[in-house]
Amino acid sequence: MASGGSPVWALVALLSLLPLVARGERAVGAPEEVPVSNPGVQEAARFALEAYNRASNSMFCYKPVRVLKAETQVVSGMQYYLTVEIVNTRCEKKVGCGLKNMGSENCAVPSEAEQKQICEFVVWSRPWMQDTRLSSISCTPSSS
């Protein structure tokens, strides 16, 4: 017997989602905007910037200016989608780029405000496995 009914079931499944879309509701598991002050967001931003500093070719550390936007998505763990404004400092990487070192005068921000960048980070956290990963980085110079 031919299985010609499968396209019909796909259409029925798709049509069943229309009421959710029409009301503006999000599908279960879709990314959801959260306050930038959320502790999980702040921890993910800290992790992302430390990973960015390790990976960058700059001799100096970057530090966060502010988290501009944050979304979370429940996956196998929590995925954080972050838009963060960062700035280059005068703090040399050999001193360390941890937040405790960022307050010193050596980590002052150069007067050239062109050092700012807007970065999109995706951080995947699975706390029960003590596993946090930076899945994606994309930075562009800030226009402000």
Swiss-Prot record:
Localization in the cell: Secreted
Lineage: superkingdom: Eukaryota
GO cellular component: extracellular exosome
Molecular-function annotations in GO: cysteine-type endopeptidase inhibitor activity
Residue ranges of domain Cystatin in the record: 29-128
Record's keyword terms, sorted: Disulfide bond, Protease inhibitor, Secreted, Signal, Thiol protease inhibitor
Annotated Gene3D superfamilies: 3.10.450.10
CDD domains: CY
Protein name: Cystatin-POGU1
